[in-house]
Structures are given as structure tokens and as C-alpha cells.
Amino acid sequence: MILTGPEVAHSLELVEAQHLAQQVATFRSVTKRKDVCALNVCGGIAALTDSAFGRKLNHVTGLGMGAAVSHEAIARLEAEYGARGLDVEIDVCPHAVPSTLAVLSERGYVTNAFSNTYVRELADDDVEVSPPTGIEIVSGGSVSESTFVSHSVAAFEAQAKPRPRALLEALAVIAAARTDTTCFAATLDGHIAGTAGMSVMASPMGKIAHLHIASTHAAYRGRGIQFVLIRARLSAAREAGCTLASITARAQNVSARNTERAGFRLAYTKATLMKPLLKPTDAK
């Protein structure tokens, strides 16, 4: 299988769009907030949640994947984000239709970041991998929602540039509440060292496991915890009938290195195109 081709890219982008849509739907269900929504736009999904969450749960992905991008559609998008006081941030796949970059460029969008999408084929021998001595993996019903949420938030908060606690809590609660997602925890000598999630979604190429929300407590970093959690999720994905697994990560960070060590390949790099919110003072 050619992992860098358009067929794989379309499936990976579909899965990422589904993932974002499910995050939004779950957050809406948990909070009962009617202002939270996910909009279909030109083949992609636009997430609109709490403005305090920034771009993580307020951005667009999958735009232009098999669908033309129009000025009218983007203008409506800008109005939706502007009404909430948010910049518009759109993650654009290099396999998007040509009109995507043309329209965004004409509307004043600029690139402000990049992210890598990694993919890995799954094989039967992925199921046979066992964790190193001393490390135990627990998942599913063996990891309570409160345990997953508290440890996920604590580990992410200890990072050099932590996101707001409210966002970290929302992401963990969402992962624990989703019916398509399995939560994992790695214990070392009986203590939880790290946590992670895996969402299984359908695509034209079969079921794909999207690996996400992985974190390690500061005291256990550098001891291979995340690598073990990746391997455990690959095993579970294969058992669930998945043909591929995907991970998105910023280039040159620890997640990207662990991903490549686990046999993932870079499928493509996406650009984040952003248009700042036009404030009343800017228009004068």
C-alpha cells in the first residue's frame, strides 16, 4: 500500500474530521450547551465550542477534500467564528482541491503553523506485543472515567507550555465519554505513569484507529511510557479489525519521535492557515 498517496490521505482526513465532529458532539452532550456545534463546510468540519479553548476545539479540518471551496462558504465561516470573537484557523491537507489555497489566499489567510499526519499499516503480529517487565497496560472498563481524567489533566498540566486547565479537563472528559474511544493507562510498579486514547472510525479503506490525548507524568518521562502506550493501542486496534492507525503531531516534538519509533510513516504535512479576527478598531 502506498501510504503517501491521495487515497490514504482522503481516508485520514475523513477520520480526522469525524474525530473533531465527535469531540464537539460529545462536549455538547456532556455540557448541554446549545451554542456548541460542528458545521459541515466544503468537505470538512468546523468546530465551534468555547472561545476559552482557543484553536484546539475551535478550528476547521478536512476543508477542500473532494469538495470545491467557495468565497461564499468561507465568508459564512468567518461570520460564525467572528460572532464568537475567534480567529479562523484552517488545517489544510496538501491533497485538498486547488481552489482551497486560491480562495484562502485571496481572502487574506496566512500560514502560521504546520502539523504532521502519520500513518501505519497494521498486521496480525501487532497483537502479539507485550509491555516490558514492570509496566502494565490497563484499558476500557479497567480505567474509570475519574482516573483517566485526573491523570490526563495532571500530566498535561506539567508540560512546559500547558493549555488551560478547563480545556485539558474537557478533552479528557470527551475522550472518556465517547463510545468510539478506548482509554488506556500505563502503570509502572503499580503507579499510573501515563494515559492515552484511541478512537476507531470507519473510512473507505476500512476501520482506522486514531491515536490521541497521550500524556506522561513528569516523574516517569524518558522511561518509554508513551512508546509502550502506542504499542498497546496498535495491538488493540488490530484486534478491533483496523487496517490503519493514524497520529497527528507537531514536527520535532516528543510525540513525533515516539510515533516514528513505533513504525509510523509521515503521510503528509498540513499547513494551518489563519485569518485574524477583524476588530472594530482595526477597521478604522
What positions do the PLM features span?
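N-terminal charged segments
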Residues: 1-82, 97
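Short amphipathic alpha-helix that is part of the acyltransferase structural core
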Residues: 1-23, 61, 115, 124-172, ...
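A short helix-loop-beta-strand connector motif used in the catalytic cores of GNAT acetyltransferases and
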Residues: 30-37, 85-86, 112-114, 173-184, ...
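A conserved beta-turn-beta hairpin within the catalytic core of GNAT-like acetyltransferases
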Residues: 51-59, 112, 201-211, 221
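Acyl-donor-binding surface of acyltransferase catalytic domains
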Residues: 66-146, 255, 271-275
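Conserved acetyl-CoA-binding loop-helix of GNAT-fold acetyltransferases
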Residues: 70-79, 212, 216, 222-239, ...
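Conserved GNAT acetyl-CoA-binding A-motif
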Residues: 84-93, 237-250
